[in-house]
Amino acid sequence: MTTTRHRLLATASRFVTTLESLDVDAMLAVRSPTCLHHMCLPSFRNYSITNDQTREAFPQWKATITKYQFGILDDSQTLVDEQARKVMIRAKTAAETTVGDYNNEYVFILRMTEDCDTVDEIWEFYDSLRLRDLHHRLEGGHVPIGVDAPAPFTTTGSNSLDRSK
């Protein structure tokens, strides 16, 4: 018999695997149709995006990446709250982009659906200095970013989507 904890961890593992795959269909398949992805970085910009917005932004993001690795930084720091259906993971990325290397660390909090099979909400926290450096290099390389660019390349403005529970 599979426990709630095992189902939550299996879904979190699929989330990580799909991020590394750079396959937008696989990335969205592990999410519920109403999943919101919150970028939580007060010193840079907070915003939330839907699955449709993720799909729209993905080609631009993927076009800047030539090699990509994403994974759990430390399994011992993974936390599971079975009652809230949440998993917190600490992750890292190492990428080669069209404007040089990009490395970052992340904390993801994933809230799963009631059956624990898909991710219903994502809170993503990351090192803003490293992201800002990448944005400056992209701007220098004339990659369109800013208010009119699709997320995750938007740098100003706000999004009022809120699914606080």
UniProtKB/Swiss-Prot annotation:
Pathway: Secondary metabolite biosynthesis; terpenoid biosynthesis. It comes from the Eukaryota. Gene3D superfamilies: 3.10.450.50. InterPro entries: Fungal_Meroterpenoid_Isomerase (IPR050977). One of its GO terms (biological process) is terpenoid biosynthetic process. Part of the gene cluster that mediates the biosynthesis of calidodehydroaustin, a fungal meroterpenoid. The first step of the pathway is the synthesis of 3,5-dimethylorsellinic acid by the polyketide synthase ausA. 3,5-dimethylorsellinic acid is then prenylated by the polyprenyl transferase ausN. Further epoxidation by the FAD-dependent monooxygenase ausM and cyclization by the probable terpene cyclase ausL lead to the formation of protoaustinoid A. In A.calidoustus, the austinoid gene cluster lies on a contiguous DNA region, while clusters from E.nidulans and P.brasilianum are split in their respective genomes. Genetic rearrangements provoked variability among the clusters and E.nidulans produces the least number of austionoid derivatives with the end products austinol and dehydroaustinol, while P.brasilianum can produce until acetoxydehydroaustin, and A.calidoustus produces the highest number of identified derivatives. Belongs to the trt14 isomerase family. Homodimer. This is Austinoid biosynthesis cluster protein J. It comes from Aspergillus calidoustus.
